[in-house]
Amino acid sequence: MKKDLLTENEVIDAVVKYFNTKGRTEVKKVVYRADASQKEHGVDLQIKLANAKGNGNKYFIEAKGNKRADGTAMRSTFNTNFRWAISQIILRIKVDSTKNNYIYGIAIPDSEIERAKNLIRDNWALKTLKIRLYGARHTENGDLEAIEYLPSDIYN
């Protein structure tokens, strides 16, 4: 697979696009979306998918690109950035996700997904927390898209 270089904002854009087409829910709302170029703090993306009664899931996603917001090369390695994303998402977990319909994930360029899976595949804590991965990439025509990797796709 060709390495797709994406900024954090491009990764976020791809994941938002994915969620806008996900499932049959009636309410698809981006609750919060960070702008990496502004160096904002907090979760990078919060999305609510719900039915007409408001019942559904809230997604909290930490995103990492493999190039800076200004388009220049990253100084840190992928492993360092991905481990940083893991720590950030874990620190944001404040409630039992299974009782509150909260889903946590990390979004990265899809060309880095196999490396990410290899880093976390045997991690009991991340498997128990059901941390998902989202792979962002450019399509053949240059559009952004994302793929959701469920816990069953990731963990042993």
Feature annotation, model-predicted:
Residues 102-156:
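Domain-level recognition of nuclease-like catalytic cores that cleave nucleotide substrates
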Residues 50-52, 92, 111, 138:
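Generic structural motif
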Residues 15, 27-30, 45-47, 61, ...:
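Hydrophobic beta-strand residues in large extracellular and virion-surface proteins
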Residues 44-48, 55-74:
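Active-site ExK catalytic segment of metal-dependent nucleases
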Residues 63-125:
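Catalytic cores of nucleic-acid endonucleases
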Residues 37-46, 142-150:
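Short, solvent-exposed polar/charged micro-motifs at secondary-structure junctions
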Residues 1-41, 48-54, 99:
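Acidic-basic catalytic patches of nuclease active cores, encompassing PD-(D/E)XK
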Residues 21-29, 67, 150-155:
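Short N-terminal signal/transit or membrane-insertion segments
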